[in-house]
Amino acid sequence: MRLNTLSPAAGAKSAAKRVGRGIGSGTGKTCGRGHKGQKSRSGGGVRVGFEGGQMPLKIRLPKFGFTSRKALVSAEIRISELAKVNGDVIDLNALKDANLVTRNIQFAKIVLSGTIERPVTVKGLKVTQGARAAIEAAGGKIEE
C-alpha cells in the first residue's frame, strides 16, 4: 500500500453543489437563494443572536455571577504531577521551573489525584486534606 493509492470509500464523499450553471441543474439563476431579500444579497444575513427586532434571549434573561480576578492567578496541582518536580522541596517557584504552572500564577493548591511515591516537602502552598494525608503517608511533610 502506498499513500498515492489511497482513496476514500465509495459513497463517502459527495461532490460539491455547483450553482449558477443553468436551469436544468436545479440550482441555476438564483442559485438556491430565492428572489430578492436580505439573504439573497452578497454578504447578506443577520448577526448571531438577532431575532428580527424582538428583544433577544441574551438580553431577556437576567445577568448573574461574576468572574473572579483571583481565579486568573490561581492553579490546582495534582499529587501525581509532583513527580515532575526536581528536588525534594516543592514551592511555587519549583512548580514554575517544572512548567506545571504558568509564570503569572501567584497561588497554587495541591489536590489528591493520583499517587506519590517519594517523600517531598511542600512549602507555602495550600494542600487539601486528602493530599496532605497522601504526602505524609509517603514520608513527606507540609510547611506553611
UniProtKB/Swiss-Prot annotation:
GO-annotated molecular function? rRNA binding; structural constituent of ribosome
Name of the protein described by the UniProt record: Large ribosomal subunit protein uL15
Protein keywords: Ribonucleoprotein, Ribosomal protein, RNA-binding, rRNA-binding
Task: Please describe what this protein does.
Answer: Binds to the 23S rRNA.
Biological processes per GO annotation? translation
Q: PANTHER family under this entry? A: 50S RIBOSOMAL PROTEIN L15, LARGE RIBOSOMAL SUBUNIT PROTEIN UL15M
Q: Where is this region: Disordered?
A: 1-49
Which organism does this sequence originate in?
Shewanella pealeana (strain ATCC 700345 / ANG-SQ1)
* Name of a matching Pfam family: Ribosomal_L27A
PROSITE patterns (UniProt xref): RIBOSOMAL_L15
Query: Could you confirm whether the keyword Cytoplasm appears in this record?
Result: no
Q: Which domain of life is it from?
A: Bacteria
Q: Where is the composition biased (Gly residues)?
A: 21-31
Indicate the family of this protein. Answer: Belongs to the universal ribosomal protein uL15 family.
Q: Which gene encodes it?
A: rplO
The answer on whether this UniProt entry bears the keyword Signal reads no
Q: Which InterPro entries match?
A: Ribosomal_uL15, Ribosomal_uL15/eL18, Ribosomal_uL15/eL18_sf, Ribosomal_uL15_bac-type, Ribosomal_uL15_CS
What does the subunit comment say? Part of the 50S ribosomal subunit.
